[in-house]
Amino acid sequence: FLTRQNVYFKKHIMLLIIFTMYFSGGMIPTYLTVRSLGLYNTVWAVILPTAVSTYNLIIMRTGFASIPRGLDEAATIDGANQFVIFSRIYIPLSKAILAVIFLYYAVGSWNAWFNASIYLNDREKYPLQLVLREILISNDTGSRISDGSMSDFEGIGLSIKYAAIMVSTLPILVVYPFIQKYFVKGVLIGSLKG
């Protein structure tokens, strides 16, 4: 949408989007919005506030702008509508950029614990990173207040801590090799033209 030549006010729209990147609404208005929408203590409270990133939107925009307009025009002449052009031309040509955006979102969401600590009250719904944070904090606090009789439990606490760190790191380590071939290409395509 923002890469097309015939869109009026596209520079103004981009300025508004970039403005939100530098000056966000803040934590309290976001919390009040999530609470008033009835999303508090649901998984959607963690997903929706971070669903669209301005930085990733700019990368996608520059990636789509690098696709030649001749393909768009040729598909229109052949009778394709906007949905067909998007799904059969733009998406296949943007696999590298989509893989990079997927990796950015995956790593960012996987490592996020702060939003979950604000929006989730039920311990059953805590994500792994928040559970890991609680394990690390409780283990650190337990080692500070323990006396000689607790030395046996310190080894168990350290084992649990390191096992939780491995479990939290493993999914990203498994996914990254499959996306790595797209990663460098997608980052370069998204940064060259703009």
Show the residue positions of the predicted features:
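A hydrophobic, multi-pass inner-membrane permease signature
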Residues: 1-194
